[in-house]
Curated annotation (Swiss-Prot):
The name this protein goes by in its record: DNA mismatch repair protein MutL
Gene Ontology terms describing biological process: mismatch repair
Stretches with biased composition (Polar residues): 374-391
Biological source species: Halobacterium salinarum (strain ATCC 700922 / JCM 11081 / NRC-1)
Entry-linked PROSITE patterns: DNA_MISMATCH_REPAIR_1
Function: This protein is involved in the repair of mismatches in DNA. It is required for dam-dependent methyl-directed DNA mismatch repair. May act as a 'molecular matchmaker', a protein that promotes the formation of a stable complex between two or more DNA-binding proteins in an ATP-dependent manner without itself being part of a final effector complex.
Keyword annotations: DNA damage, DNA repair
CC annotations in GO: mismatch repair complex
GO function term, MF aspect, one: ATP hydrolysis activity
Biased composition regions of type Basic and acidic residues, renumbered to the chain: 352-362
Lineage: Archaea, Methanobacteriati, Methanobacteriota, Stenosarchaea group, Halobacteria
Classification via SMART domains: DNA_mis_repair, MutL_C
UniProt cross-references to InterPro entries, sorted A to Z: DNA_mismatch_repair_CS, DNA_mismatch_repair_MutL, DNA_mismatch_S5_2-like, HATPase_C_sf, MutL/Mlh/PMS, MutL/Mlh/Pms-like, MutL_C, MutL_C_dimsub
Amino acid sequence: MTDRIRALDDATVARIAAGEVVERPASVVKELVENSLDAGAASVDVSVDAGGTDRIVVADDGRGMTGDDLRMAVRQHTTSKLDDASGLDGVGTLGFRGEALYTIGSVAELTVTTRPRNAGDTGARITVDHGDAGSVAPAGHPAGTTVEVTDLFGETPARRKYLKRAATEFGHVNRAVTRYALANPDVAVSLTHDGREVFATTGTGDVQDAALAVYGREVAQSLRTVDADPAADSVERVHGYVSDPEVTRSTREYLATFVNGRAVTDAVLREAVLDGYGDQLAPDRYPFAVLFVDCEGVDANVHPRKLEVRFEDEAGVKAAVEAGVRDALLDAGLVRAGAPRGASKPGDAEISPEHSPTDRDAGAAGGGDAAGQSDGNGQRTAASGATSESPASAFETGGGDEAADSAASTDGTRERPGSGTESRTGRFDAPAENARLPTGAGGPEADDQDTTSERDSLPDLRVLGQLHDTYVVAEAGDGLVLVDQHAADERVHYERLQARVDGASQALVAPAELELTAGEAAVFEAALGGLRELGFDAELAGRTARVTAVPAVLADALDAELARDVLSSFLADADGTPVADAADAVLADLACSPAIKGNTSLAEGSVVALLDALDACENPYACPHGRPTIVEVDGDELAARFERDYPGHAGRRREDAGN
């Protein structure tokens, strides 16, 4: 580096600029497919090897180019789609900047072969090798254009090393091609990976036919029609399809939204779709959507890869999409049959009807139904004497009798924390026992604590009670501690499950069959080795995964959605250690479901048992999803909050004492 300012050479400028357009193989595929669609193609065939890192081929039967046009097409900012700046406001094509072929040729070896329609049998070919364009030569080719890309980032190793595993890169390619296939149902679109066809749409013009090809029969049959003419002046029409609330996935990637025919990943549109479902979706589940928004006042020139747009009337667009989705679901009479697996918000376990602490104590003293009461809708709710899911209630590994026995007094009545009943001896004292015991004094975990002194431990606590039946309130040596009972119990369940994962499998009585989308099926074999490390035994027949054995620790809890989420964890992984990451994600979800929920009143013994179990964890300070389990407020902060340190405070106290 020198201190002098100088102009960069053209090759360097081209490679820097290419980084804004070509980020990964999927970026190349996106640009080339857009060119094919803009050329009026009736069929577009995409083929990639090793997720596109080795080779990409996009072939179409569009208008094609002459030799002279081909020579111009690989130059910078050359296009047939835009004349001048005045056309930017009303651009009607997917591409318009004239950058695609030039930027791809700057960072890869690019070969374009083309022939215009009704132009004889001879076409033209040109090769661009990392910015070095050759001459145009005659070549035989059917009407249309074929673009081949190899050695992507071959001369920019710093860029290539940031590419992910082939399965991950193919996931991005599949997502891009899928969206164009859904957005253009009148075009026959096919995708091939490593010589194997992933999907092929028929080009009939029916979006449901396209969805059947890429998502499978289960999803296609669940799609509900959205067709609305909104009141907003800026929105002409909202149309497409959304899935039943019960047909969901654990990621947002199946929310496909299009603005004026262009695929976009706009947060406003995605949130509007989710809001249209109201409370029919759990927070961690996302529907399928193929939704088109035709509107005015859209700026598509705000993102290098045109993935985002800017709306003049953002609020009007959001309201129109939300209303369209909501009306479609209402017209279909769809209501959620039950909460999907994995709901983890404290409110999901709200007890109804609500009672005050006095009401609950009175009910307990009166010998209420300890098994729970009906809420009028066929759902059972925890009665005042129940502890819901105690810290040792599911995936039991020992100590369950003690925790269960401590949940109620001997006469069957229920005591709240703070009632003065005696609890078992340990580091976490019941309210009646004002003296705190030193670390390790008593309790079944004392011996273990000596051998695990390096792990984190909770401070000595004296339980004061529960706040809103959601947080345990306790006094620490220097301040106040709040414990989130749901997050704490999640951590306990998670570490117990983690200790039981050993790769052992358990055969299923009847094989579980799971219909996959085209993208999931395409990478199934790549993920199979990792799945077997976890204890799964499965095979793929067409689009159906047949699971014959599962990890022993999951045998009692496995369902179709959980199995699908395991696969999704492998697909989403990008750091080279998918097995451990997938296992942790699954265990975290499993730990969530049986954990004590918010708005659940706990018996005094259960609170102490929960704190003992949390203290025995390797990491007692966070749930497996990363949320804190405890919040500490020390004495200094309390004093500051009450302004006990303001100037003259001590002197005024002395004066008051003298009076």
